Amino acid sequence: MTITTENKTVTHILGYPRVGSQRELKFAQEKYWRGEIEQNELKEVGSLLRHRHWGDQVGAGLDYVSVGDFAWYDHVLNTSMLLGHIPKRHDNGFPDLDTLFRIARGKAPTGCSCAASDMTKWFNTNYHYIVPEFTEDDQFNVSWQQLFGEVAEAKKAGHKVKPVLLGPVSYLWLGKEKEEGFDRLSLLPRLLAAYQKILSKLEALGVEWVQIDEPVLALELPKPWAESFKLAYQVLNGNTKLLLTTYFDNITHHLDKIVELNIDGLHVDLSAAPEQLNAVVDALPENWVLSAGVVNGRNVWRADLSHVLDVLQPVKAKLGQRLWVGSSCSLLHSPIDLDLETDLSPEVRQWLSFAKQKCREFLVAQALDGNAIAIQECAKYSAPIKARATSALVNNPDVRQRTNAITAALAERTAPYAERTRQQRAALNLPLLPTTTIGSFPQTNEIRTQRRDFKAGYLTEADYNTALKGHIADAIQRQEDLDLDVFVHGEAERNDMVEYFAELLEGFAVTRFGWVQSYGSRCVKPAVIVSDIYRAKPMTVEWTTYAQSLTDKLVKGMLTGPVTILGWTFPREDLPRQGIANQIALALRDEVSDLQAAGIKIIQIDEPAIREGLPLKESQWQAYLDWAVNAFKISAASAEPQTQIHTHMCYSEFNHIIKSVAALDADVITIETSRSDMELLKAFEEFDYPNEIGPGVYDIHSPNIPSIEQIVHLVEKAETLIPIERLWINPDCGLKTRNWEETEAALRSMVEATKKLREQWQEKAV
């Protein structure tokens, strides 16, 4: 078969990681924020990375390079900037890069500091975005030129470009009203006028196709929102072709509306929802292209290209050149380059594929076009992932036997909360409004250097452990000086709250350069679950008991919960998520038992990821919540009644799942609430949460120091919903990313505010 441009299968990705394989963007951003480099130097790093990443795509043979997927903080904030949609407190007339940073962080090298905008999770991922703020009188004005500059930049380099835009309906959905009494959907006509201008500018730049992302189509949308797409895409129709992109789940429940839209192509995620393919193909209008998202942008596993070929060959036969092949979603969620991972075992390495390698998996398009050599290469490429199913490394009979023996009783504490709290109050003897922190303290340059030197072999294990004990002792003394009530050991030994446990539990592979952006300059390095999971020995007991030996105050044991470990790693794909979570839960249960036996009276099991793990469709939530809650309870249920179990949730908009949060049966839950001005506590207006709660009283993601008055205001607001005897006082989240000066100043305000509140309460009691 002769391949021509007429019948060639077009290849593209929905986006590429932006931080750089060595986190170049992160380090440049942080230098700029500290005033160590000028803005033009930061922009040079961005340009260098964009050209490198376009080169990766072209080098892999992709037909289009994605432009507009680069962002200085996140792509939703980029969209706000593009639309001139700036919160009034940050609006200085003409938006620039420092405007963007002030919206995201509350401060920038120029301009006045003020409250950062809210930040939340991007659908069910561990990526975050800055939430757009909508008011009734909002206007949209295309004023920030970054997208158009990048298109010109890529075209000048000789690339065939496909700009990436967040669609108007999704943009509105992802924001929130800052005023009561109006619906942000009413802003759609005004917003569409701005989008028309954007598309006209792209057309003038010679753009043929625009990728317009509408991921909310995977949700079960309210009727007015679902119907709004018809208006949106009537208005946006023009000479530039629109590829409507959906991802993360099935969209067939909206298919009848989608096929009526005035667009030129549809992208569907066949990694997350392969079952939708036939329905989409059957309904596809005859003049549309179908972009099949078959290269998984959310995992690190090598694609089974032989299977992909089998699935797509009938579609190719039916659609011909109207079939495109793409990534399931943006490759933003994948690490960048597997070639850097020289420390992984050869057996594990051959199962994996990172963003750069995933671009090469579009070899399958050549196979679809009938290239015999490509068909053979697809079979060769797929062989390791097929052989993995029978690898002795993957399956552990003892772990399977233990998980198969799980019963309902294994997930229950030996006493109900009412009895536990009575015993705990007697055993712990804490004051009204106990003060504590969430777990981590600043990871200083000294700590990071010592960890790096230890891993490189420049520091012996004995010397490293001595250094860590010094950092723990320092953290304990600082807490003594601050007069906190419940201490933490500070987690100096942990580089990451999940990776630390992944290194100590059997069943994980840990990478060196597998960084993935979480938000802004914050990157995480998810471990990979390659086999059955179990605990070979205690993981945290030594450090926790050492910290406890240094003080008469209570020191919390600190664990990361099973759902979060699962959610913040790359899971294996041959076991259901519930089964993996139960394996982790049993390992943590053993750790809880050992901490308790060592005299630790408060144990925190963090579950910040429980909300983000929810399926996108609300009708599927309860099934997920049932097994997620059960996994947490399995991990905690070995605790005796007098042992107090804490859990922590951050960025968790859990108002809709409050009953499941209560079902965790944690004695104390701490949550992020300050950035939303305690808005998350609205859940407690209608639901009487039975246990103790610590609503975060200041935002640790901002370097701004809270005042005593601000904290008092937030606690008084919380007190209207939670009885004061069940309130704890704590920051929103861990303090790992802050420096000690900021940390101590903020905690000093928190403790002083608490003492002031106690005095007020005592005066009331008299």
Curated annotation (Swiss-Prot):
Cofactor: binding comment: Binds 1 zinc ion per subunit.
Residues that bind Zn(2+): H648, C650, E672, C733
Domain of life: Bacteria
Residue ranges that the Swiss-Prot or TrEMBL entry lists as coiled coil: none
Keyword annotations from UniProtKB, A to Z: Amino-acid biosynthesis, Metal-binding, Methionine biosynthesis, Methyltransferase, Repeat, Transferase, Zinc
Pathway membership, UniProt: Amino-acid biosynthesis; L-methionine biosynthesis via de novo pathway; L-methionine from L-homocysteine (MetE route): step 1/1
Enzyme class, UniProt record, top EC level: transferase
EC number in record: 2.1.1.14
Annotated residues for binding of L-homocysteine: I438, G439, S440, E491, D606
Cofactor section: Zn(2+)
GO BP of this protein: methionine biosynthetic process; methylation
Similarity comment: Belongs to the vitamin-B12 independent methionine synthase family.
Protein's recorded name: 5-methyltetrahydropteroyltriglutamate--homocysteine methyltransferase
Organism: Photobacterium profundum (strain SS9)
